[in-house]
């Protein structure tokens, strides 16, 4: 019986010791920081973002012009195909690879 008591006391003592050492480890994190958002770092980040935006502006414009040019090209080809298919010329046919209206007999471009 005394061995059991010793073991229980030892286990209790170890548990209390463990709790005593772990309790001070937890830190208090209830610190509130309020900033206006206008710090030197945020101003520098904003300036860098603006500079990068301006540097890539030319590239964005080129990409947009290219996309618009491709769309215009497809639009003109679509209209030309419609005109070719609705043409009164029975020898006219639409060549999809070259996007042109051609004459079946000569292979030359036909104005629909």
Curated annotation (Swiss-Prot):
Pfam families given in the database record: DUF1283 (PF06932)
InterPro entries in the record: DUF1283 (IPR009700)
UniProt keyword terms in alphabetical order: Signal
Annotated signal peptide: 1-27
The keyword Transferase belongs to this UniProt entry's keyword annotation: no
Positions in coiled-coil regions: none
Record-stated family: Belongs to the UPF0482 family.
Cross-referenced NCBIfam families: PRK13659.1 (NF010180)
HAMAP family in UniProt: UPF0482
The protein, known as: UPF0482 protein Ent638_1930
Source organism (scientific name): Enterobacter sp. (strain 638)
């Amino acid at each position: 019986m005394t061995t059991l008591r010793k073991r229980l006391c030892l286990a209790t003592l170890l548990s209390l010791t463990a709790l005593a050492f772990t309790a001070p480890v937890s830190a208090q994190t209830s610190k509130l920081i309020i900033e206006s958002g206008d710090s030197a770092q945020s101003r520098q980040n904003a300036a860098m973002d603006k500079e990068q935006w301006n540097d890539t502006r030319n590239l964005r414009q080129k990409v947009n012009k290219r996309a618009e040019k491709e769309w215009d090209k497809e639009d003109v080809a679509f209209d030309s195909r419609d005109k070719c298919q609705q043409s009164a010329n029975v020898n006219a046919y639409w060549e999809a690879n070259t996007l042109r209206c051609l004459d079946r007999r000569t292979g030359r471009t036909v104005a629909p």
